[in-house]
């Protein structure tokens, strides 16, 4: 019961919500809270969000966040609870989402245990039947990891918004990395179910890529020029993105520009394969 009391104090959840979540008697939780020296208040109507924000997908921001939720959002199976937790390094991105839905509460710090180590993360959570039902209708369902399907393209008021959905999903379940020791060749990976990824790549400028299975996880991989093409497609002229991945994209843009300028300067000069001039795009380890 001590953990439930702590969650009541830390998250501002209602007693009714905690009773459903932990299958405990609401009165017993109330008594435990009072015994711990805290006041019991009616929180049922204190937490507010714009629960109709996804009723129509008609802006870049809505399409992007829907894609991100398909990757990292969590809709509960029974109690109409939504939760999204991100690593501490992405705290600002979660705050953007919190502002996007006009959440009346701030995001909360939580401790996550992984491989016997404890890490800081931040969580946005609330109860809203309409919000959760809308996500489920689009395909963002509970326990979606192994059953996720791509949404019907007709939910987007403009087909151009599908690209923003793709970017949102990539920011959540994709990565930008390298595939050689010198960190000079870009590689991007996108994880998901086979069914979802097959539909996802249909909207990319390069498709028909083979989906590989790595540690039981299906993924699409694009290397070198194809990886750069996909990044360009996803991020160019966009206004909302995960900042750290966008910075990696810009870093590769600068490096590829230098490479192209070098190659152009060598045209007609009898390019020396052993030239001492190199292009360094590592600037440390590139991974996201």
Where are the regions a protein language model picked out?
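Internal intein/HINT superfamily modules and their associated LAGLIDADG
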Residues: 1-288
